[in-house]
Design a protein with these regions (language model features):
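A mid-to-C-terminal "edge-of-domain" accessory segment
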Residues: 4-5, 11, 246, 253-420, ...
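Alpha/beta enzyme core
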Residues: 5-7, 17-42, 55-64, 78-199, ...
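Non-catalytic terminal/interface segments that mediate subunit docking, oligomerization
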Residues: 17, 22, 30-31, 365-473, ...
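Short, ordered loop/turn segments at secondary-structure junctions
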Residues: 47-48, 73-76, 100-102, 141-143, ...
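Short beta-alpha connecting loops at secondary-structure transitions
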Residues: 67, 170-171, 226-234, 249-258, ...
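Catalytic alpha/beta core domains of metabolic enzymes, predominantly
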Residues: 175, 181-305
Length: 501
């Protein structure tokens, strides 16, 4: 009989720490609902004390989802725990995730403290959190570099204090898989009453070993894994949810199973990628567009004879289905609504669906077929409806051997502004014209263009990074016209620093 492994998703907390990947509350709810459909056991919804936005997001996510446990992160600080408990008040199943650094590096340089004081603070935090909730998870930050004997003392003490889950993070991504596995095994063998709590993994990917370390932890007794969709996260990212889910599905001999509905992996991956403006690496395991592509002649020949020659997974097991409905200009609202639902996006408001359908028809008139990525892009355009600064019109004249000229119209909170400029190419001319209206000192730091699919009629995605007053702001634009997409991305940056200011 298989043992149960609990999946703790931290896409909305740790995953959102990627620069430029911040979501608003509506988008976070959308992801949380998709994670519920995916079958995750715990959703870490945010760090409530860090900002009013995170606090509100935890409240709204608690209201929006039904069966997963909603978790809020805190430091080992009473105020943090108070705020987290308040944010979780609407959650049907709630957990407070509190903790403190336990490595000598953290104790000495971060806390200017000693081991005994850190141990006392850890126990006090768990006891304080237990006043609010039964389910308390403790994290020993930088456990990967904490010596096993002291770590075991901390784990034993917090379990005695009432911790129901103990998280052993490889915070810096330093551990080798064998080393991390031995650490979990040591705890399982040396901590009294270890059976009273679930040991959890939380691995970072700085050396590319997050998934391997997580798997090693599971093989040695951990029964919760902390993961993110597409492996997104701070620095080099976290353990990828889809990788752990499919490893266990492919290796049933391990005798460990999750509650993940793997057929929703692809849709979840694309939703997160679209909302966070974070392109998926083409050769990314499980969810990259090349994950099930075969270009080598020898491989193609084998697959044509029998797919098992080179494919260890059925693409349909992760939700990749080549027989899906093709959307064109003749597709109706029902077909679009069905496709949105398949991608995890449900619209109860007919007005919002009508608005997306109008955008869909405009795009379908320009393209032969509208793909799933296009649909996600159209749905994501909702976030810009509330922006104070919007593009009204754009006209560009360009050619070989001549300076490009751009005329642009901008709507700023209902007021219309127009300007024109020349430039070294159409994008440069359009951005210069826009700068004449905005009159802010901004420096373009990063500019990337990506085609969503293939074809001359494809939608281009532009990711942009702009520096203003010492701060970096990230913008995104998508359009069949790459100049318009570039201007949209620049305006997105401006709206973000206007909101931040």
């Amino acid at each position: 009989m298989s043992e149960r492994l609990f999946v703790f998703d931290t896409t909305l907390r740790d995953g959102e720490q990627v620069p430029g990947c911040q979501l608003n509350t509506v988008e976070k709810i959308q992801v949380a609902r998709q994670l519920e459909q995916l079958g995750v056991d715990v959703i870490e919804a945010g760090f409530p004390v860090s900002s009013p936005g995170d606090f509100n997001s935890v409240i709204e996510i608690s209201k929006a989802v039904t069966w997963p446990t909603i978790c809020a992160l805190t430091r080992a600080v009473e105020k943090d725990i108070d705020v987290a408990a308040d944010a979780l008040s609407y959650a049907r199943h709630k957990r407070i995730h509190t903790g403190i650094g336990t490595s000598d590096e953290h104790i000495q340089y971060k806390f200017n403290s000693n081991r005994e004081e850190i141990l006392e603070r850890a126990v006090a935090a768990v006891k304080y959190a237990k006043r609010y909730v039964e389910d308390v998870e403790f994290y020993a930050e930088d456990a990967g570099r904490t010596d096993n004997e002291y770590l075991a003392r901390v784990v034993e003490a917090v379990i005695k204090a009432g911790a129901t889950v103990v998280n052993i993070p490889d915070t810096t991504g330093y551990c080798l898989p064998e080393e991390y596995g031995r650490k979990i095994k040591y705890l399982m063998e040396h901590v009294d009453h270890i059976d009273r709590a679930i040991i959890s993994t939380h691995c970072h990917n700085d050396l590319g070993m997050a998934t391997a370390n997580t798997l090693s932890g599971v093989q040695n007794g951990a029964r919760q894994v902390e993961v993110t969709v597409n492996g997104i996260g701070e620095r080099a990212g976290n353990t990828a949810l889809e990788e752990i889910a499919m490893i266990l599905k492919c290796h049933r001999q391990m005798g460990i199973e999750t509650n993940i509905n793997t057929r929703r992996i692809s849709a979840t991956s694309r939703m997160v990628s679209s909302l966070m403006n974070m392109p998926i690496q083409a050769n990314k395991a499980i969810v990259g567009r090349n994950a099930f592509a075969h270009s080598s002649g020898i491989h193609q020949d084998g697959v044509l004879k029998n797919v098992s020659t080179y494919e260890i997974m059925d693409p349909k097991d992760v939700g990749v289905d080549d027989t899906s409905i093709v959307l064109t200009a003749r597709s109706g609202r029902a077909a679009l609504k069905h496709r949105l639902s398949m991608l995890g996006i449900d619209y109860d408001d007919p007005g919002k669906l009508d608005k997306i359908y109008e955008r869909f028809l405009c795009l379908a008139d320009k393209k032969k077929e509208v793909t799933d990525d296009d649909v996600l892009m159209l749905a994501g355009a909702d976030r810009k409806d509330s922006h104070a600064i919007k593009l009204d019109f754009l006209q560009v004249t360009t050619g070989m051997g001549v300076r490009s000229v751009a005329s642009i119209g901008i709507d700023i909170s209902g007021q219309k502004f127009e300007e024109a400029s020349t430039g070294n190419g159409p994008v440069d001319a359009a951005i210069k014209a826009l700068k004449k209206i905005i009159l802010k000192q901004m420096t373009l730091r990063e500019f990337t263009i990506q085609a969503i699919n293939k074809g001359s009629d494809d939608v281009g995605k532009v990711h942009m990074q702009v520096e203003h007053d010492g701060h970096l702001y990230y913008g995104f634009g998508a359009n069949t016209d790459i100049v318009t997409a570039s201007v949209d991305a620049y305006i997105d940056c401006i709206n973000k620093f206007k909101t931040a200011g």
